[in-house]
A protein has these predicted regions:
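Short C-terminal tail/terminal secondary-structure segment
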Residues: 2, 81, 221-240
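C-terminal substrate-recognition "lid" of short-chain dehydrogenase/reductases
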Residues: 163, 198-227, 232
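Active-site helix of classical SDR
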Residues: 107, 142, 150
Length: 240
């Protein structure tokens, strides 16, 4: 599969070394975009909480390309499951620092390059930004912050022709989540709650992200798009 309108584009994907981010990189490249990966595993490593590292990559992009067409913020973390009253403040801060501040850092570092090309930003939120998950208060609050930040970006950058959207993935098999799905009880419960009845693949999330980043979505901005197999639509059919 390829997405039309991206041949010759330039793109940056934070968290592009694995999981959803890596799937986005593959699809962007198949669609003809020159794609740069900003990840802890790249050389040099890029930590989204380190604004200087992002600024260095942005300077390289400006020197080599003069602008940026697509920014995908897929870098994120998921910490331990704990009820709210047992949640360490450090866990909450760490989730916010990586998931929200990291997204903000990247948007600020690459903002002028996006404005130069009237580009597009797509942030990776979560179904947890729309429907809270039990014992995931830190992650839920952080991804809710990503969704709210996305809407603010859409308003602030519209006058520059820059679009900002987010996807809200449902349960997706990635290196970050694979431990959950090794638990058969959890997997049965999760798939039983998803109307489509299955765990999603990273490539399915990537398809939605790259669509939103492409000219095919030229009139779409400020949207948080659930890609969740129907999780946020409601309960699966009842056996009447």
């Amino acid at each position: 599969m390829t997405i039309d309108g991206l041949d010759g584009a330039t793109a940056v994907v934070t968290g592009g070394g694995s999981g959803i981010g890596a799937a986005v990189v593959r699809l962007l490249e198949r669609s003809g975009a020159t794609t740069y990966v900003a990840d802890l595993g790249t050389a040099p490593p890029v930590d989204v909480t380190d604004r200087e590292a992002l600024d260095t990559l942005a300077a390289r992009m400006e020197a080599e390309h003069g602008g940026l067409d697509v920014l995908v913020n897929a870098a994120g973390i998921l910490t331990q499951n704990l009820p709210v009253d047992e949640l360490p403040a450090d866990d909450f801060r760490r989730n916010y620092e990586v998931n929200v501040i990291g997204t903000l850092n990247a948007c600020q570092a690459f903002g002028s390059l996006l404005r130069a090309r009237q580009g597009a930003v797509v942030n990776v939120a979560s179904q947890a930004a729309l429907v809270s998950l039990p014992q995931q208060a830190a992650y839920t609050a952080a991804k809710g912050g990503v969704a709210a930040l996305t809407r603010s970006l859409a308003i602030d950058w519209a006058e520059h022709g820059v679009r900002a959207n987010a996807v809200a993935p449902g349960f997706t098999l990635t290196p970050m989540t694979e431990a959950f799905f090794q638990n058969e009880t959890f997997t049965r419960a999760a798939t039983g709650r998803i109307p489509l009845g299955r765990i999603l693949e990273a490539d399915e999330i990537a398809a939605a992200i790259v669509f939103l980043a492409s000219p095919l979505a030229s009139a779409i901005t400020g949207v948080v798009l659930p890609v969740d197999g129907g999780w946020t639509a409601g309960e699966p059919a009842l056996p009447w």
